[in-house]
């Protein structure tokens, strides 16, 4: 299976820009965010200048009922925005528990579904993705 790299998915409005120091820097369409990545124990690769371009950051707090909260540095659309993967559109928006509304690592599965749907010659079907945790 392909790794989730921009060059493997040129038609995806998502990019994992950097990871390190227990964080990940991600681009969802025009918006950039910092979220926790507990297994990213290595140093960050990009400069602090690049990380400071983030529009928001989600941090965990001990004792907080929700586990954490967002701090936004700029205004993002309250009702979310759309990002594209091939001919699929996903509505995304930061949630109170640190998610954005989709799991980019599911891209190989979406591509598999797209490729198999093409073989059905527009026959109507229903798909249930039981591996895409949605919260």
Regions found by a protein language model. Give the residues of each.
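Structural motif
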Residues: 31-32, 126
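Conserved class I S-adenosyl-L-methionine
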Residues: 122-133
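Non-catalytic substrate-recognition/targeting regions of SAM-dependent transferases
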Residues: 10-26, 33-104, 111-114
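The AdoMet/dcAdoMet-binding core of the Class I SAM-like
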Residues: 110, 115-116, 124-125
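Short acidic/polar capping segments at secondary-structure boundaries
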Residues: 96-98, 132-135
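Single, functionally critical "micro-switch" positions that shape active/binding sites
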Residues: 28-29, 130
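N-terminal accessory targeting/assembly segments
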Residues: 1-8
């Amino acid at each position: 299976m392909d790794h989730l790299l921009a060059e493997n998915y040129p038609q995806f409005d998502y990019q994992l820009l950097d990871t390190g120091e227990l964080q990940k820097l991600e681009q969802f369409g025009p918006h950039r965010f910092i979220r926790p990545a507990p297994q990213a124990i290595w140093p960050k690769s990009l400069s602090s200048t690049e990380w400071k371009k983030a529009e928001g950051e989600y941090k965990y707090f001990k004792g907080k009922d929700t586990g954490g909260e967002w701090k936004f540095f700029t205004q993002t659309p309250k009702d979310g925005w759309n990002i594209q993967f091939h001919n699929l559109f996903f509505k995304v928006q930061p949630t109170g528990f640190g998610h954005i509304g989709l799991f980019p690592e599911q891209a190989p599965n979406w591509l598999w579904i797209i490729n198999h749907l093409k073989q059905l010659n527009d026959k109507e079907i229903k798909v249930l993705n039981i591996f895409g945790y949605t919260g």
